[in-house]
Amino acid sequence: SEHVHQTRVAIRRLRSALRVFGDWSTDVDPDWQEQLTTLFRELGSTRDRDALSEGLLPQLQQAGAPFVQLPDAPEENSIPIEESLRSLDSINLILALLQFVHQPSKDQKKSGLKKDIAKKLQKLHQQICKDADHFLELDIESQHRTRKRVKRLRYCIEFIASLYPGKELKNYLKDLKPAQESLGQFNDLNVAEAMFQDLVKRKQKVWFILGWIANEKKYILEQAQAHLDTYAKTDTFW
């Protein structure tokens, strides 16, 4: 499943680049976002299950859970992964992206490149700082949005890292990373909770797991809030 995971990460990174920097070229096809999203979903969530098996299950075992096993995976996708990647739509998308990368650009970015980068990064930075002000009061969807913003910002910084002094950039990422990790852990717990809620009617022992997850979510949420508070005070490098 590692190659599938890496493909999904690559798609996430590309979607972030197109979303934030896509206006730099008139050759960017606006349909690519939707096509990449479709392909991402078709690749399924096997990696989510692997991550839970490696991280959550040992914790449950250590906590003395009477039942330590992930629920069976739902039939979420009737299209095999290799078939999805070999489909005409996927091949056309890959060819279009390759053509975009290798063809000479008609658009020559003007001298205000760093100014434009700063504007884009500042927008994401401010959105995350605004969320940090009241993160614990946000609903689940808004907290999920914060997680995606943090991840998108990190990807964007990695894309333009060579243009900025290393020390300031590293310090910024150092304060961003803990927030990303705690938000990722919170998301994993939400995924696990949804999995086990479907099973609890058939297996009463699962109540222990749901109780443990609920308690862990409270702890991770407070940790995420603390990490976001620290991040909100960090100096920007742009």
How would you name each of these model-derived features?
Residues S1-W238:
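Function-determining surface determinants
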